[in-house]
A protein has these predicted regions:
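A conserved acidic beta->alpha catalytic loop
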Residues: 25, 40-49, 71
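Short beta-strand/loop segment that forms part of the nucleotide-sugar
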Residues: 33-43, 63-68, 93
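Acidic helix N-cap motif at the loop->helix transition within catalytic regions
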Residues: 20, 45-54, 96, 100
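Conserved nucleotide-sugar donor-binding catalytic segment
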Residues: 143-174
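Glycine-rich, basic loop-to-helix element that forms the pyrophosphate-binding segment
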Residues: 67-83
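Conserved donor NDP-sugar-binding/catalytic core segment of glycosyltransferases
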Residues: 100-131
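N-proximal low-complexity "stem/linker" segments adjacent to membrane-targeting elements
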Residues: 1-28
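Short aromatic/hydrophobic "clamp" motif used to bind/position activated sugar donors
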Residues: 88
């Protein structure tokens, strides 16, 4: 068994404005046994200075890696190779998640022996004032194919590591 229940991989490029809010939402998750893998994809802004503060404050939880720019897919692939969790989650560095998200996903995955657990999401305006529920993912049973492949989003799911470690994201995308 791995040390962590969930490894969360965050590719980082040009997000110094958002990365603190993202990391705050992850270090404060109600699921304690998580590993946060931050992959700096060669960003030139001050994101790494912010990341370093979190690594120092949460050394058992936040891990930072710096690599040459290869795009979001390349950074996710790199992060997956570092992951030690039983499940893998992905968060975009300009996003944040609700504090119970990974606990709920993990508990559902374990209780139902799932390879993938999926949750809904909100679309939030730049000023954080307008939250709109994205209904596309709310009823998985009604729309399984679209939930898995329609949006091609990875940030509202956890995947059993044994499933995704055999796959790779395309590099040089975004």
């Amino acid at each position: 068994m791995n040390k962590y229940k969930v490894s969360i991989i965050i590719p980082v490029y040009g997000v110094e404005k958002y990365i603190s809010k993202c990391l705050e939402s992850l270090v404060n998750q109600t699921l304690n046994d998580i590993e946060i893998i931050v992959v700096n994809d060669g960003t030139k802004d001050n994101s790494q200075k912010i990341i370093d503060k979190y690594v120092k404050k949460y050394p058992d939880k936040v891990k930072s890696f710096i690599k040459e720019n290869g795009g979001q897919g390349s950074a996710r692939n790199y992060g997956l190779k570092q992951a030690n969790g039983d499940y893998i989650g992905y968060v975009d560095s300009d996003d944040y998640v609700e504090l119970e998200m990974y606990e709920k996903l993990y508990n559902k995955a374990i209780s139902d022996n799932l390879d993938i657990a999926i949750c809904g999401n909100y679309n939030v305006s730049e000023d954080y004032k307008n939250k709109k529920v994205d209904l596309e993912f709310i009823r998985f049973e009604d729309n399984k194919i679209n939930a898995l492949f329609g949006k091609k989003a990875v940030w509202n799911k956890i995947y059993k590591k044994s499933i995704v470690e055999k796959l790779e994201f395309r590099s040089k995308v975004w």
